[in-house]
């Protein structure tokens, strides 16, 4: 059997590795490097990939593509700002997708990434002496479904059979924990070239269980580079009244110089930036030069807000895992940007311990991917290793009043299964529409709809009598199945929703952030909806009493009917004062009416305690809307 490889398809650099003698090993490329720049250049019919492409970038900026991972699987309206910073032309493609124009040809990001993968696999095949066809490819933990699918398609375009797409922090944890025997709680801090993930895992007895994950999808080493680029350009503009960012060749040279300075500042207190002949004076055509010295202190000042953004995902991951910093046994640094001294200081400050640097931050992810490939191929040297991941956002259904009823909460381990009982909102309601939602906000409209389906053929019965059993089932592949069954009739309907993490990363972060920022407003809205729902339920109960006690005194029926009508109008008005007034009046009239019927022996109180009796303890008091 041909060996399967593990590939870290990075924003800045990529790495390929394979299992050798029970251990993962990095495969060097044709140039002898352990990492390959994720850079592709087009020169006529020739395609250059890796270091050779990077070397000629300044002379060929419009056709040298880098950081393409930031565009893969994303919509145009998500990447406009990043596109504007690129020396090459990024534009809107079919259906709001992203395309890169090179020499009059429109390329999808997947095509460009496939060139990097093809280079990695070709070099590795030559080193191993066998053709490689199977691979595990890693992605950031917060990559959405379209980004994961696009990454997989890039592998397929490169001629690979993609065995699995796994999360980068989980892969890094595999590499770290492969030979460790004890039980540990590990925080993986992954700051790469374009993305930032924090994942907390529990390791022990061959089990790698993800407890929580958080991240910032617009934070990576490239953002630190761009701050240096902007500083250099603004300094030059102040001195010469010329913006270098408008000159593609000059911009490419600035980007390269910024990255080099950032790397220098990881080991030195200052870096000299010298770019002779950076451009020409537009009037005199005399050459212009850029000479600057960037200190580490100035670099940290330029990136202060980026460094602050590093803190929040760490704090969120700890909170979601219900852990304190003292519960973390080890901190693993992944990604080249973790070499920035200020980043290391922040991590140590947040967790209270020195990060474990036994794992190479550039290679750990690829090594872990090779371990996963070995597991899939049944490598006996690995023994029994189990990975347990989580769902990143809450899953639920929309109920009466436009609210979400949570079914499976954020950071629940998968596979997972949950069943709840719901009921109908109206008398003789023939069907219900199930709106499956994902998100952290209490109102359905503020969350992502994953799909809708209808359960029809419910037998005629009073509101609240139907018992609709809704089951959410997420399998190990992340595929969500939702089933709804009316227990009286046995009528059943279902929907399968593939890849439930279909939100783009910015949507995930926005939902969590807005949930925190709008907690007070959400609470008020939720309380308002609950008051309206309570009054409407009481109105339905009053109507049922009138139907079941037709022989009651006319004045008593008229009084209750008037109170019920007022309640209906108050619910429609959504006016808090009217709702409270109508609630008090209807409660009083209903109590008087039912007491009179009991005394007269003309009827039993039907459902007077419907919302608190033991019989209804398993029924959630949040009714569905009627299906259209």
Curated annotation (Swiss-Prot):
| Pfam families per UniProt | HSP70
Keywords for the protein's UniProt record, in alphabetical order: ATP-binding, Chaperone, Nucleotide-binding, Phosphoprotein, Stress response
Q: Which GO terms describe its molecular function?
A: ATP binding; ATP-dependent protein folding chaperone; unfolded protein binding
Q: Nucleotide-binding: present as a keyword of the record? A: yes
**Which intervals carry biased composition (Low complexity)?**
596-612
Q: What induces it?
A: By stress conditions e.g. heat shock.
Q: Where is the composition biased (Basic and acidic residues)?
A: 555-591, 614-628
Q: Which InterPro entries match?
A: ATPase_NBD, Chaperone_DnaK, Heat_shock_70_CS, HSP70_peptide-bd_sf, Hsp_70_fam
Per the record, residues carrying Phosphothreonine are 195
* Family label: Belongs to the heat shock protein 70 family.
The protein's role, per its UniProt record: Acts as a chaperone.
Indicate what this protein is called per its UniProt record: Chaperone protein DnaK
Native organism is: Deinococcus deserti (strain DSM 17065 / CIP 109153 / LMG 22923 / VCD115)
